[in-house]
């Protein structure tokens, strides 16, 4: 349970930063709309720095095996998410906003700082596997669901700055190109802002939403419980059944990196996409807020179960 307790401590620290973001908006020092400026810094500057820095590692057979392993696990997890959605959406009468909030987690923004704290920066590269799979599905499956069509947003997939950063980082890794020390140091310094900046943005988003309505709307709890508890438990049981941790050396630590991505709250990008496609962005925002707040308790619980079962 040591890792679970450490995770709880790290989430508590991030929650304090979230409160800071909430307070600066409520104190009228910033407007909720100011978060859009910070979002640009987060998406187009901080995230690419984290990704590029993650791939500045030595090329060894163990790391290559770990990358292939984490990619296979990430693909498998998303297959489970999509299959689960197919099974439950009609019996539970889930609308499209609820469905995509259950399927897609906030892995990119939340997992990387947690992986850095729990396992070390050398494991961040494995979390990129989940992000790659999710980015592709966000702009294909999620986009099609929200548009109500099968039209694929290939241009948005291919020019997504984080996907481009992953491709660039992977090429540097495969070609054994090490960036100069000052550049690596700069990437690391900027990348270290990912946790605080992500939580500041979450706090500012929460300040914009009437919390009474979020917490008192009972329907909101259904997709949130499915995202934070039911889906993670199903994934965990499947990982145990197939003995996934034993597939490669250091499998448990790498598996935890990918599993952390699967147990995070609803994806913030879904709300932005809901606005883009004229869907119920307020409902999506409410699910994001509720799942983010409740994940403070559920994520340590799920990692505790992971330690016991895997």
Which residue ranges define each predicted feature?
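Alpha-helical transmembrane segments of multi-pass small-molecule/ion transporters
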Residues: 1-310
